[in-house]
Structure formats: C-alpha cells, structure tokens
Amino acid sequence: MTRRSAIRNAGKAVAFAGLSLKAPQASAQSVYGKRQVTALALTGDRYHNIDYVRTALGKTLVKDLGISIDFTDELSLLTAPNLKQYKLLIMLRDGMIWPGGYEGPGGRGAVVSDPPINKFDQTPVYWMTVEQGKAVKEFVQNGGGALFYHNVTYISPQNQEFRDVLGAVTREHPPLRPFKVKIVNKEHPITRGVNDFVVTDEQHFVKYEKDPKYILMESVNEDGLTWRDAGTSSVAGWAYDYGKGRVCYLAPGHVITALWNPEYEKIQRNAVKWALREI
C-alpha cells in the first residue's frame, strides 16, 4: 500500500467512525448537518496525547457504540453556551498547561541542542477557571451527563466546583505496572455482567468524597506493591445522579491497551448509555 492510499483509507475509516476531528463550531449541528453531536470530549495534555485518546474512544464509543463525538484539546471551548449543544461531556486530561514549554513528555533526560536553546520557564499553570468549573456543574445539574476518566482528579485541587461534581481528588499514582480492577457493585447497570480484569496502566489513587454506595470498582495491586501511604488499592470507579444529570468516573486510561481491555470496554459503553439515561 502506498503512503497516499494509506492516508486516503485512513480518512475513510475516520469518516465511517463518525468522528469530528475539527474543533466544535458555533453549532454542533454544523459538523454533521442536521444530526446533533452527542458528546464533547475534552482530552489531551502534556502526558496524554489527544491522538491515543481519540483513537481509543473512537473505536469503543463511536464505532462500536454509535455515538457522535466532537474531540478537542481547546480548553476555551469548555463554556456554558457550548456545553448546551451536547448531551454528554467526556474528559480525559489533567489540570495543568505548560505555556512556557517543557523538555519532553516526562521532562527526563539531558537536552542536547547545537547551538544551545535559551532556558525557558517549565512552570505549570492550572487552566480551569472558576467560570468553567461552574459551567460543568450547571451542565450536569441541568440534565447533562459527564463521563470522567483517569487523570481528571488532578483538576480538583484547584477548582472546587469541578471537584464537587467529580467527587474526588487525586492522591497521584505510581509508574505503569499491572493491577487488577475488581467490580464491587455487580448490580449497577454500568457493571452488570462485567468480570474483574487486569491491565497494565497507571494505577491512579484517589481520595473519594461521596457516599460509598456509589462505588462501582476498585483497583488492587495483587503483587503487594504499595503507593506511598495509600496501600495497594484505591477506589477506581463510581457513578451517581447529580441534580438532573449523571456523573461517572473511571480510573484506567493512560494507554490504549488499558482502554481497549474487553471488560473495560463494556464498562465504558455502559457508562455512556447510563449517563444518557438509555439504561
């Protein structure tokens, strides 16, 4: 296959999947003609490239489930007027941006440049404004659905409105390593019929701040590896009504292989249907 034909075929595959690769316009309907886009997905940060998120969710939620999603990493699109165009907000990104630049995905290793580059400020800035936190809160309270993944718990320390919607704050995470995800509520529509599963991923530890009855699953390092003073396990998923809307959080999500675990894909698709009140 030539490079040109590969690009052409890839474009056809994206169109078939129903993905919007453009930033959302003034009206979500403009992307698909008269067919309204179901979800806005705000994804991608320094440590989580938007491409892998779009690829992973494009398969699981768009192609396999059939919903339409506007994927974007443009933070300014998280506004109350824009959210009104959607039924569902999906987020997989942390709370920081790095306007001064950074050395690499992990900031590790020596930087070689000839001639030398000027030193730059590698200081993170917390991006979510008070108004954006309120916009998310009002969107869900008024009937919208929210599916939060993985590292959104890093937004909570700097935004109380978002923290209240999400229901948790990060306790950070160890490096990539295998762990088991155990289903603790097998009767909820999101986890019904789903088996425990194992992934190699970042095991995110969180401080969960809502009623324990909403917990769906927990992550456990069965090799006995701990994380700081948090032990070997953490709450890894929950779901609850929030005002007229619904919120679900799912912890795995640092790599495609975790997002595409067959049991986890069931959970993600069920979470979307539950958030949209289809189950």
Where are these regions (language model features)?
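Twin-arginine (Tat) signal peptide motif
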Residues: 1-7
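N-terminal export signals
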Residues: 7-28
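Aromatic-Pro/Gly-enriched surface loop or interdomain linker
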Residues: 27-88, 95
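Extracellular ligand-binding/catalytic regions of CAZymes and related secreted enzymes
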Residues: 32-37, 62-63, 67, 110, ...
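Catalytic beta-strand/loop cores that center a nucleophilic Ser/Cys/Thr
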Residues: 34-35, 62, 157-246, 251
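Short alpha-beta junction capping motif
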Residues: 38-42, 83-156, 244
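Solvent-exposed loop/turn segments at secondary-structure junctions
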Residues: 45-48, 75-77, 95-98, 152-156, ...
